[in-house]
Amino acid sequence: MNTALQCRDPVVVLEHVDLYPSAGEVPAGEWDFCLPVGRAAVRRAGSEVTVLSYLAMTGYVLEAVTRVGTVDAEVIDLRWLDRASVDWDTIGESIRKTNRVLIVEQGALGTSYGGWLADEIQRRFFDWLDHPVQRVTGGEASPTISKVLERAAIARTEEVADALIEIAKA
């Protein structure tokens, strides 16, 4: 929030409800701490596949990588989703190392952020890709008040684990 307050441009802050109960490290005593604008965070270093995610799905990705155990995935939390602030340097460095990309998001396959991201990765890093960009998304149904229907609509750890195994053996 501090970064958004210091920015001179309009800002939209997305607070994902699944992140409310989570806890993480923050700089102790630094009440004015700001995230660097336009910088992704490498949450796990790896050499076999680059996994790009954001918001609550980053936690599911890390859980899936641990569960699978046999895939050395580099997990990148995008953090900044506007097109002008995407951290292409971090993404590109990882792709040149792994040569494979898996994009993970909760939303539906249709006109999602991941579709644009996959297209842009193909344009920018085609020569470094040994495999088509893969995606894990939620179902076509919208999340609803029913927990059963919500589970059917949103991607979780199991879907990510399956995709990691698939892309690693391809």
Which positions does each model-derived feature cover?
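Internal gly/pro-rich beta-alpha loop/helix module
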Residues: 1-9
